[in-house]
Amino acid sequence: MNNNQLLNLISDIERCIDSLGVMYRIFYREKSSHSLSEKINKDPEKYNANKKIQDLIGVRVALYFVDDIDVVRNALQEKFQFIPEDSQIDNPTVETFSATRCNLVFRLPDSFSISEIVEARHQAIIDNTFELQLRTILSEGWHEVDHDLRFKCKGDWIGLDKENRAFNGVYATLETSEWTLLKLFEELSYTHYKNKNVKAMLINKLRLRLKPSNKDDEVLEYLKVNEKLIKKVFRYDRDSILKHLSTRPKLPLSISNIIFIMNVDSFNDHGLNEMTPSLLRNWWESSSI
């Protein structure tokens, strides 16, 4: 197998997500010849030239926070050729509870050669696609158990409605916990705002992977003596930051750069304008929309 092809694809995915700064873990696999043969032999009539196997390459992205799923999905759909008709994106209903899927199918890059990793006898029924599943860290373990002990053993669960519902109920509990987690960090951010701990307020409000910058201390000290500006920072919408990051080249993410973005977008504070590097202003002007 040509592992370099797979690693290059994963690097492209990571660069796309890293540009947003969101917290995540990534897992991936390439179906082995044995696994591929097993899948085909299990139902020989299922796959043909009109219905091909689309998950030769499988990727899972487990996000720390549930509100980042749509943000990452949109970024990936901009980066790769998305195939909506083959993807599964569930909309939860109020009447029932069950796992919601966000299984996305994309075209493989033109540089990716299926023939290098698939035996000639199978190539006609392998699509030049990869499947990417978006999940949360809290739901990841549940999905693993579900896949190995329910999906792969469907016969063991036939007629066991009570047990199926109870198992789905575990997922519902995790889903509730995910929203509770978001609320907790909102409250943490507010507490630090009231205590004028600007750095902690930002870390808990943004929930992004931030790196230190030599301008951070200067910016934080400036904010501490400008209480009205602190209030504006606290009220600034996190989704707006993610939108700006997703429509521009990758930027080193630091507390100071995030504040500079807020300022050029909304505050137009003279003191912050004086501190803002020209490189960041050029970055701001490079929006793709």
Question: Language-model segments: which ranges?
Answer:
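A generic structural signal for short, solvent-exposed coil/turn residues
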Residues: 18-20, 53, 96, 124
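Short acidic, glycine/proline-enriched loop segments that cap or flank alpha-helices
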Residues: 49, 120, 229-233
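Long beta-strand-rich cores associated with HINT superfamily self-processing modules
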Residues: 62-184
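Short low-complexity stretches enriched in small and charged residues
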Residues: 11-22, 56-63, 86-90
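Generic alpha-helical secondary structure
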Residues: 2-10, 66-69, 73
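An acidic, glycine-/histidine-flanked metal-binding catalytic module
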Residues: 2-7, 16, 126-277, 281, ...
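Polyanion/phosphate-binding surface patch
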Residues: 25-69
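Surface-exposed, low-hydrophobicity interaction/linker segments
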Residues: 4-43, 254, 271
